[in-house]
Amino acid sequence: MTDVVLRTHSLVKRFGGITATNNVSLEVTRGARHALIGPNGAGKTTLINQLTGVMPPTSGRVELLGEDITALAPHKRVALGLVRTFQINQLFNTLTPLQSLAVAVSSRHDAARRWWQPLGRDATIAAECEGLLEQFRLTEHADRATKELPYGKRRLLEIALAVALKPKVLLLDEPAAGVPAAERADILATVAALPADVSVLLIEHDMDLVFSFANRITVLVNGGVLTEGPPDAIAADPEVKAVYLGQTEPAHG
């Protein structure tokens, strides 16, 4: 039986008379590369905000590793292994990538409480930061101010910071948004290569990226789940073509 690491039960979010998410039940399995797609206004980011605790649901439940986390604050969900990135970068622009990673890694080791010691001085923390810089191809940019990095590198840094927190489930909200086309596939390939014990839930509008990345896809329309399945089944689904992809056959078949 496949392990479920993240599960929602009938999540509903209403804003007055508007239902943004409508009885959304979703399962993300261990090691999954799972994509959440849908047209603008489908409720994707609202759903992610409920998963991470930024926005409480009107009704329903969120479970992480079998534990009900519906009422937990965002930082407590992060501590349990539910980590996200944002559609708009959330970075320390005046710090270097090395310094930023030292902050993230140190916070996990509780070293940030030892404020009188330089961040990253600990050999274990320094080695982990160096490993992350190499993994995300940021080594040559390690000592540049983040605000000076090319945009694609800033995107990679944000994902590296999330990975530094040792997520069990990584939620990526359009990680390739604004990135030059030539660099988008590289970003998703880096994410796909994360260890198998890291489950990924991806929101992305670029269908070529989605179908090359995901082993399971959930389609959200008007706040509810239209369908879910493997990429081939989603690509062939006539309702998905009509509502989201249009009538043209996707290039990926």
Where are each of the predicted segments found?
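Glycine-rich phosphate-binding loops of nucleotide-dependent enzymes
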Residues: 2-253
